[in-house]
């Protein structure tokens, strides 16, 4: 196995994993790797990631925050622009949260 391969999150239907800076989503009920989709490229490698409780979106921490919607809607990135970078880590979703919220720790060296 590739030493750069990291599983960021896994649920009943999906596995979120990275190889270096690229983050992929795999439907674990399909064996073919060509069905894996790239959901983000994170400068400096991703720190952590999650798949929302309802399997609606993927959230990735590292250089900023990346949100990728699984229904095909356009995702977005926050804090990834060269003039506005912030570093995030430890992204998670609490059982006490509404399904649309995630929590993370942010650090910016100014």
Kindly give the residue locations of the regions a language model identified:
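Extracytoplasmic/lumenal domain signature
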Residues: 14, 32, 103-110
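Repeated scaffold domains used in trafficking and secretory/extracellular systems
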Residues: 1-14, 20, 37-55, 80-99, ...
